[in-house]
Amino acid sequence: MTAQLNPFRNAFRLPTKQRINWFPGHMNKGMRQIQQKLRNVDCIVEIHDSRIPLAGRNSQFFDTITGSGVKPHILVLNKVDLLGPKQQRSVLQQLRRQQPELKNILFTNCKDQRNHGVLDILPLATQLVGDSSRYNRAQSAEHNIMIIGVPNVGKSSIINVLRNVHLKKRSAARVGAEAGVTRAVGERIKIQEKPAVYMIDTPGILQPSVTDDEMGMKLALVGCLPDHIVGEDLIADYLLYWLNKHRRYEYVEKLSLSSGPSDNISAVLAEYAQTHGMFHRVKQYDGQVEVMTNLLAAARKFIQFFRTGQLGSINLDEHA
C-alpha cells in the first residue's frame, strides 16, 4: 500500500539566504539608555505578546536587565483577548516547564481598563519591590518601574491605561499601530500617588540578529516588525504554512476557498481577491493597462484576519 503524501510543507524557509534583521540605531541607543538607568530602577515589567510567549524573548537581555534575577521581574503577556482561556492555561504550563525561574506571570488586555491582569500589575510590582533588597534605593519612598519588551506589544498602552486608572489622567506615552513608535528611553511617568510610583517607557528591543527563520516570521506575523521590512506576501505565506501545519483550517471558510486547504499562497490569495473583487490596474512595459487581481491587498486582509482573532485563538509557539 502506497503511503499518502503530505500535501503541505513540513518546514518554512525564507526565499533568500538573508536573515530577518531589525536592529536600527534607536535600538542601540535605547539599550545604552536602559543600562544607564538601571541603578535607579526597582522593578522590571516585561511586556510580550501572549500569542508568542517564547519567540523573541531574549534571555541574555533579560539577565542583563534584571541583574540575573536580583531585581524583581514581572512577565506580562498582553493581547490575551486574542488567545482565549484554554490557550492561556497551555501557555502558562509551557512557560513553567521551559522557564521555571519565571515566578510572576500576568495575562492582560490593555484595551480593557477593567481587565484583572492590568489591574494586578501595580499591586504585584509594589509588593515585589517591598519584599526586595533595594540596595542604593533603600531610603527612597518612590518606586521606579521600567517597562521593557520587543516592539509593538503594548508597552506604552499599558502605561497609559495604568495612569488613567490610578490617577484619572490622560495618556502620557505615545502609542501606535506599527512597531517602533517609542524610539528612546522616556522620562519617568507618574502612575500612582501613594506610594509614589513612576514608570519608564523604553523602545522595543529585538536581538541584534534574528537567526531563526521561524522566530523572525512569528515576530513579523504578530506585528513586532513593520510589515514592509519582511513583506506582506511572505508574512501571509508563513501564516498559511503555520495554519496547515497545525491543522487549523478555519481560513478555508474565512477566505471563501472553494477548493479547500491549500499550500500555495499565490493560489489562495488569487482566489480570495477574485471572489471579493480585489483588482487593480497595472501598466505593462508596452504602455497597455491590464486589470489584475490585487494579491497584496488580499495578503493584507489575510494577515488582518489573524491579528484580529478572526482565525481563532492561536499560540504560535505551540509545541515549540
UniProtKB/Swiss-Prot annotation:
It is found in: Mitochondrion inner membrane. It holds the Pfam family MMR_HSR1. Residues 31-208 form the CP-type G domain. Keywords: GTP-binding, Membrane, Mitochondrion, Mitochondrion inner membrane, Nucleotide-binding, Transit peptide. SUPFAM superfamilies: P-loop containing nucleoside triphosphate hydrolases (SSF52540). One of its GO terms (molecular function) is GTPase activity. GTP binds at N78, K79, V80, D81, N152, V153, G154, K155, S156, S157, G204. InterPro entries: G_CP_dom, GTP-bd, GTP-bd_ortho_bundle_sf, GTPase_MTG1, P-loop_NTPase. GO terms for biological process: mitochondrial translation. Its main location: mitochondrion. It is a peripheral membrane protein. One of its GO terms (cellular component) is mitochondrial inner membrane. Plays a role in the regulation of the mitochondrial ribosome assembly and of translational activity. Displays mitochondrial GTPase activity. Belongs to the TRAFAC class YlqF/YawG GTPase family. MTG1 subfamily. This is Mitochondrial GTPase 1.
